[in-house]
Amino acid sequence: MQHPGHLIRLALSLPPHIALAKAARFARRLADRRIRGWLYRDRCSYPQSPGRLRRSLDALDVSIPDSFGETRLLFEHRFDLLGSGPVRVAHGERYKGFGPHRYGPSPPLPADWRDAVTAELSPGNRKRARTILDQIPGGYTPIDWHVDFVSGFRWSPATWGGGIAYAHLPGVDIKLPWELARMQHLPRLALLADAGTLPALAAEFRAQALDFMGSNPPGWGVNWACAMDVAIRAANLILAWELFRARGATFDEAFEDELAASLLAHGRHVMANLEWSERHRGNHYLADVCGLAAIAHALPDSPESAEWRSFATTELNAEILRQFTPDGANFEASTAYHRLSAEMAMVTAALLLGRGESLSDEALARLAAAVRFAAHVTKPSGEMVQIGDNDSGRFVRLETEDRPLDMAPLIAAAKGLFDLDLPVPADTLSVTRVVAALAGGRRFPAPPPVRRPLPTGPVENSPCLRLRIMPPAPAALTGLEAVAYPDFGLFLWRGPRAFIALRCGPIGQNGQGGHAHNDQLAVEIEIDGVAWTRDPGSFVYTADLAERDCYRSVMAHFAPRRGSGEPARLLAPFRLEDRAGAKLVRFGDDMVGRHVGFGSPVQRRVAIEDGAIVIEDTPGEGEHVLRSPEDLARLWGLILPFSPGYGRKG
C-alpha cells in the first residue's frame, strides 16, 4: 500500500521536472513489478550448481576475541545495525518503530516453519526452496530477511525485486533488510571461532546461508532490489566460507553445491543489473565490480566466470582512477563514502593480485593515496571528520570492535597490501592478516604523496564578523601540519592535540551532489579530544525526508549564513544544486575560501593568532569571544543532535 501523504511531501520537495521524472519511474516500477511477477511467477529462478568452488585462502590462523558476547548474539539472531540496537530478527517479532511510525508484526511461524516460508514465495520457486530449507537441521529458528527491523514494515518475498517499493511509507527504511542481507556478520562468525567452537559456528554459518537461499529466491524480494547489496552479500558469503575452510572447517557436498549455485545466481543478477551510468556512476557500480571479482574467482572455471574475471579486473582498474581523484580522495564528496569505496577497492585489489591478475601502477598509487587521505581526515580522538553523507556502509567488517567513525579498518586493510608507516589499533590486526592472505603475500611500496601548488591570492578586507575561539590550553594549537586535498575540497591543520578543517570545494559526483551537504566554508574543530564544532552527520535517508534535509542544511553546519537561506537548493533527497561554486583563495598561514551561493560572494578566513582560532566572515559585523563549545553552539544555533552513524543520534 502506498502512503499518499508521504509521496506528496516527497513530490513537493522536488522541482517539477524532477518530480515528474520520479513519478514516471515509480509508475514504471509498479508496472514492472506486476508484469514480471506475472510472467515469472511459475518459473524456478534457482540455477543448478556449476560445480565445486575454488579457494583463495590456504590455512590461516587468525581470530578476533569475543569481547562483548557477539557469538551469543549471532546465535540468537540478534543484530545491531543502522541504529536498530541489539534486536532479534525473526518472524512475528514486534519492533520499536521509527518515531511514531510502527508497522506489523507479521504472523509468527508455526512449528513446521519450512512450509510457511515456502508458501510465501512465487509458485515456481517453492519446490527448490523447500529442498534447500530441508538441509537445515532441527532446532534452528529462521531469520526474517524481509523486514525493516526498526519500523516493522515487511516486504513480500513474492514481489519481483526490480519492482520493490521504497521511500513509499513514512518511517520505513529499506536499508535495514539490505544491511542485514549483506551478510557481513558471517565472516565474523569464522573469526570468532576457536578450536572448541569452530564446529558449532560453522554449522550456524551453514544454516544461516541456507536459510537465506531458501527464503530469498534469486531475483525476488527486497534483497534482490539493489545490485550493490547483492554483490556485497556474495563477497561476504565467499569470505565466510573461505575463512571457515582456512581455519579447518569442512562442509557437506550438498551445501557446497547450493552455495555455488547461489553465487552463480548472484553473479548473473549483478551482470544483468550493473549500476552503470556514463556520468554519475559511483560506489554502487564499484560494489558491483568488486562483488563480481569475488564471485568470478570463487566459481569453477568456465567461459562465463572467465568473462566476469576479465571484466572485473578491467573495470576495477578504470574505476579506481575515475572514482578517486589525483590527491587520493573519493569523488563523491563524502568521507564516509570514501571509506566504503576505498575498502571495496582495497580488498578486491588484494584478491585479484593474489590470484595472478594485474592492476596498473597508477591504480595502485591512487589506492595508496586514498589511504593517506583516510589517515589525514582522522582527528586525534580517532574519529574521522564527517563531510557529506554517512550511511555507515562497509564492504567487510573484520575488526574486533565496530567504531562508527573509524578509518582504522581501511588503513589496516591497506597495510596488508602496501608498505605503509601508518599506526592502527591492535584490534585491527585481523584485517591486515586477512587482506595479506588474499594478496598471497604480494606487497607494494606506497609512492610519496603528490603535492600541488595552492593559491596564495589576496583576500577581501571588508567589514567582517569576527570570532575568537579561546581554548583552555593555547599550546594545543602549536606545531600544526597543513594538509590540502583540493580535489575533494578539504583543507586541514593537524597536530597531536588539535584538528581544524575547512570544507571548500566540489560537491561531488561530477556536480550531482548526491551525497553532499550545504557545508561550504564550514569549519570543524577538535582540541584535546573535545569537539568544539563538528559536522552533525546524516542520521537517515528515506525513512524521514524532513530530517534528512535538516542534516544537509547549512543551518546544521558551522558555515557562513545569510538568514535561514540555503547556498544551494536541496533539489532531491540525493541531489544538491551546484550553485555555491566554492573556491579556495589562500592556504598556508591562514585558510581563506569563498563561495557565491547566496548570490553575492561570501568569504571565510581561518587563522591562528595569539593562541586563539580566529574566524572572519565577510560581509558581516561584530566580534565574539568564545571560550567553550557551548558558547559557539549557542551563537551559531547548532542544535541538531550529533549522529555518529546511520540511524543513530547522540
What are the functions of these language-model segments?
Residues L30, R34-H168, K175-E179:
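Extended, charge-enriched "interface" segments that sit outside catalytic cores
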